[in-house]
């Protein structure tokens, strides 16, 4: 992988006129879920994504305390590995009558509260860090509305896992796929992530 650029929070000051030339690069978050890490609840992750032409095409999400790794790649599928045991991720193929919405233990904005009111009856599952996407990929939840600030390194690896399992991550306002390195700042727009059964 020599010669492939690397972007992370620690390297966030790379100038846009340099970054905009990148076709392929690694996007890394060595500690996603800082609040979860401080609380010592185990729900923090290490995220590594491969971005190609604005798309997260491969990703690894590692939860050290849980000894669990989620990984996936475009056209190849997605898997969960616990120790030596590996299983494919296929999500829940049929939408539940009462959707399970995954959110953060540390963030629940008024916009998300309004969104939840609009979807009607639902169950709420609180999980930290990129594990929210992974719950969708596993079929343990259906929807993840993130109507608050995130950075590109917070989402890319887990988006790759979820989409490799058949899910989707789209911008809240436009409905277009969430993309990377398409503008000078590294902040994501609001987005909605959906499990395979909801990814219409």
Enumerate the language-model features and the residues they cover.
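Flexible, acidic active-site loops/lids enriched in D/E/S/T/G that coordinate Mg2+ and/or position polar
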Residues: 1-52, 60
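Conserved beta-strand segments of alpha/beta enzyme cores
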Residues: 5, 120-123, 168
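Short loop/edge segments at beta-strand edges and connector loops
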Residues: 8-10, 82, 128, 173
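Short, solvent-exposed loop/turn elements at beta->coil junctions and helix N-caps
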Residues: 10-16, 131-132, 176-181
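Conserved acidic residues
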Residues: 23-25, 57, 99, 142
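Acidic beta-strand-loop-alpha-helix segment within the catalytic core
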Residues: 48-134, 182-200
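Oxyanion/phosphate-interacting regions
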Residues: 114-118, 134-200
